[in-house]
Regions:
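Soluble catalytic domains of enzymes that build or remodel membrane lipids, polysaccharides, and related
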Residues: 228-510
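Membrane-embedded alpha-helical bundles of multi-pass enzymes
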Residues: 2-231, 431, 439-440, 480, ...
């Protein structure tokens, strides 16, 4: 369908459609965590995400060429991803010293580059479904290409799946499918709904008999999984018999002082808090102690070790570590040290977790990007990654699994620890410092990411952060306790670990990763392609 204001044939979309897509993409970014003050502040808005994607689906469905389809997806996704990650500008400009125009350009290039995946997905959708495909199969194909684009964005070049559309449904009716299919499955469901509603109701192939049977099974499966979702079940029978009293520390050390003038303050404040707390389990933020042990003042670390080894408490402390390789070279890691009672007085080894999923430009420099790093004044290091699914800390009957910073963005990696139900974590802990991004919506977005992991995996998540959001999340993904952001404080509460019960998502992802989703999406695209081909060539249609 052409518009009268399509004056330039070299431009694949009307200006009105482009503006509408930009607005819809921006609205989708808002749906992930409402950035404005008020009752909705920080909350997800699933309804807004659905409306935004319906706009994309409607325009995409009316595309006249693959070029139009590509640019529809690319423009929408560029606006959405800029709106989701604009706060990267703060780290590059304020803390990295990159001039404002260059920092803004870098954010725009990142977002528009990642949006290429979605543009390509929309072009594939057009090629497969331009004719001879029913609404049901059309919506299924759109869900398939969208989830494939989300997975590709979340895995290639180390992956950056921040802002995936599924996060907008933490508080919508779709949340109950998260323990079955995870955030990527919610992405597919939201895309399916959007195309089913937004597709132009012009002449389409009616749903075949096979398709009607398939639709009945689909509705039945969705109803069953929704009704039996672990998120709707009572976890009392699986929770620990006795609560664990925890204290989560929030230092609120300004990022521009953290590795300079703020070092002495951090050493003093965290040492005092760790030694004075009466809780069973105390957690500091990521790199709360911003020095490797060899750089610490004399008699700083030893009193901490002695305090926890002789008492009945445990602590997780975030700090960088330096170890010498067999070749004598120093290797650095972003780590967590666990201090706890030592049953064997001769034992001196502490629990250690090394961050596995490192941040590009923060903890390692990607190939060919040294020139970009040299333009910024950020203390970067080449860190060594730890392994996936490292052992949990064992304390008072709980298996406590830490993750650092944006590692909780990769649910498929956290799920690897659930492969053996007898060794699966009963509690998860996230240690973060996102002060790099200021007191912005990034704090609420990251909190919602942790909420999704708790919901997917059916385990409480404890969050200890430098500036926020320090919080306790139950196994249903609900925030039960939270400190205000950008203040110094300690959050103390009682939590119960969850034992035995493993969510369906944790079961299949821990064994097969995301491949079942990829395979199912490709199967749908194959079916849609075969159906469209048969319809165009006058053959009997065998798809739905």
């Amino acid at each position: 369908m052409r518009d009268s204001n399509h004056a330039d044939k070299t431009w694949p979309l009307t200006w009105s459609a482009a503006v509408l897509l930009l607005g819809a993409g921006a609205a989708q970014a808002l749906s992930l965590a409402w950035p404005f003050d008020g009752d909705w502040s920080g909350a997800t808005q699933g309804w807004l995400q659905c409306l935004s994607m319906i706009v994309l689906a409607g325009i995409l469905d009316r595309s006249q060429s693959r070029q139009q389809a590509f640019f529809s997806g690319w423009i929408f996704s560029s606006a959405w991803l800029v709106g989701s990650t604009w706060w990267l500008f703060i780290s590059m400009n304020k803390y990295g010293g990159l001039p404002a125009p260059m920092a803004a350009l870098a954010v725009g290039l990142l977002a528009s580059g990642l949006a290429l995946f979605y543009g390509a997905a929309c072009a594939v959708f057009y090629a497969v479904c331009k004719t001879g495909v029913s609404i049901l199969l059309r919506a299924s194909a759109f869900a398939a290409v969208w989830v494939l684009a989300e997975i590709v964005r979340g895995t290639v070049f180390t992956g950056f799946p921040w802002g995936a559309v599924g996060y907008a449904h933490l508080d919508s009716v779709l949340q109950h499918w998260a323990p079955w299919v995870g955030v990527y499955g919610l992405c597919a469901l939201s895309a399916f709904i959007a195309m089913a509603i937004g597709a132009e109701k012009r002449e389409r192939k009616s749903i075949s008999g096979v398709g009607k049977v398939g639709l009945v099974f689909l509705v039945a499966a969705l109803a069953y999984t929704w009704a039996t979702s672990p998120s709707r079940a009572d976890n009392d029978e699986h929770r620990s018999k006795h609560p664990l009293r925890v204290t989560l520390l929030q230092g609120n050390i300004p990022q521009d002082l953290k590795f300079g003038e703020g070092v002495n303050r951090a050493l003093r404040d965290y040492s005092e808090a760790l030694l004075s707390s009466t809780s069973d389990f105390i957690v500091t933020p990521e790199t709360a102690i911003p020095l490797i042990q060899q750089q610490m003042p004399d008699r700083y670390w030893q009193p901490l070790e002695a305090h926890f080894s002789k008492g009945s408490q445990a602590a997780m402390i975030g700090l960088p570590l330096a170890m010498r390789s067999e070749q004598g070279q120093l290797k650095y890691s972003n780590s967590v040290i666990g201090l706890m009672p030592q049953t064997n007085p001769a034992a001196s080894a502490n629990y250690q977790y090394d961050k596995h999923h490192l941040v590009p430009f923060g903890e390692f420099v990607p190939p060919l990007f040294q020139w970009f790093v040299r333009m910024m004044n950020i203390p970067l290091g080449e860190f060594t990654p730890g392994s996936v699914a490292q052992p949990s800390l064992m304390f008072k009957g709980e298996r406590i699994a830490p993750n650092i910073c944006y590692e909780d963005l990769f649910g498929e990696e956290l799920a690897r620890s659930f492969a053996d139900p007898n060794k699966a974590p009963t509690l998860m802990v996230n240690l973060s410092n996102i002060a790099w991004f200021g007191n912005t919506v990034a704090i609420d977005q990251h909190l919602n990411i942790s909420r999704m992991r708790a919901l997917e995996l059916g385990r409480p998540m404890l969050r200890a952060t430098n500036t926020g959001a320090t919080a306790i999340i139950n196994a249903r993904g609900e925030v039960t306790h939270r400190l205000p952001s950008a203040v110094q404080g300690a959050l103390t509460a009682e939590v119960y670990g969850i034992h035995g019960s493993i969510t369906p998502y944790a079961q299949w992802v821990s064994r097969f990763g995301l491949w079942p989703l990829v395979g199912f999406a490709l199967l749908i695209l194959l079916l849609a392609s075969a159906t469209a081909y048969a319809s165009r060539h006058g053959q009997r249609r065998f798809g739905p």
